[in-house]
Amino acid sequence: MKTLPKFKPFVQTCSDCGETQNIVEDYKNGYHVCGRCGCIVGNRIIDEGSEWRSFGDSNKVDPCRIGSASNPYLESEQLDTMISTGGGMNSYVLSKIQMKNSMRGPERALKHGMNLITAFCERSNLSRTIIDRAHYIFKNIEERKLLKGKNVEGIVAACIYIACRQEECPRTFKEISVMTAVQKREIGRCFKLISPHLERMATMSTENIIARFCSDLNLNIKIQKIATEIAKAAHELGCLAGKSPDSIAAAVIYMVTNLFPEEKKIQKDIQFVTNVTEVTIKNTYKELLTFKYDIIPENMVNKESIDKLPGY
């Protein structure tokens, strides 16, 4: 009579120290860990238990078992053992040494740049799509060595500027400069070197930023529509050719708020939101006044209000 072979249970064994008994199942991170030496033993495991939901109660331990998402642009983010920074100086030094040894020079530079992008964007409440787009642009630049020797902060700032334009949520050079503490001139230099190698680039128009500036100034939708129409008319006439979009937007908003006394804003308020100086707003506004009857839509504003516009 044919006998069945004896069943041999699967035993996890640490390949580093040979431990078989003290194998810990780490469900939060999804793998088995050797309790003696700390090395990862097996592949990722799945916890088949019920999932918990966390509602952000700071008084209790967060029950979420899911770690942070891995970055697809970093090759080093894979299954490995990391030394925690802990609370002591020794653990911090060991963690720093391990990070240097586990990542090659280019990977460390890539990770540093991506960390800066994430920090700057999250501080300014930019969306995740913009962060991912900036990561993608930065990785391409680093791999192709387009800006070798340039300041990392300048490259990061230019990547964020480009990502905002590509995702149709444009920011001005001044706004990116304030966000990253990088000079506007440096951002412009990096942008000029990167732009020829880009596949697509949305145009930076005044209409794109007027809506955001009006929202920051708590202006109603009517003011926003009139300001947008004036900006379009000024662009078609070419009366402000050579002026930056943020300067035109600031002057147009100042003009429209003067048409409606209940919505009037002083130049300092507009300067604070748009990062455009009062002198620039005043000079651009004076140039717009010359064409006020051509650019202000009469079907939305009566002629008397246009006649009463101040000269400065």
UniProtKB/Swiss-Prot annotation:
GO MF terms, alphabetically ordered: RNA polymerase II general transcription initiation factor activity; TBP-class protein binding; zinc ion binding
Zinc finger residue ranges, TFIIB-type: 10-42
Sequence repeats: from-to residues: 120-196, 213-290
Keyword Transcription regulation: yes
SUPFAM superfamilies listed in its UniProt record: Cyclin-like, Zinc beta-ribbon
BP terms from Gene Ontology: transcription initiation at RNA polymerase II promoter; transcription preinitiation complex assembly
InterPro entries: Cyclin-like_dom, Cyclin-like_sf, TFIIB, TFIIB_CS, TFIIB_cyclin, Znf_TFIIB
Keywords: Metal-binding, Nucleus, Repeat, Transcription, Transcription regulation, Zinc, Zinc-finger
Parts forming coiled coils: none
Disulphides: none
Cellular compartments annotated: Nucleus
Leader sequence residues: none
Example of a GO cellular component annotation carried by this entry: nucleus
Binding, Zn(2+): 14, 17, 34, 37
Chief location of this protein within or outside the cell: nucleus
Similarity-based family: Belongs to the TFIIB family.
Function: General factor that plays a major role in the activation of eukaryotic genes transcribed by RNA polymerase II.
Assembly and binders: Associates with TFIID-IIA (DA complex) to form TFIID-IIA-IIB (DAB-complex) which is then recognized by polymerase II.
Protein name from the UniProt record: Transcription initiation factor IIB
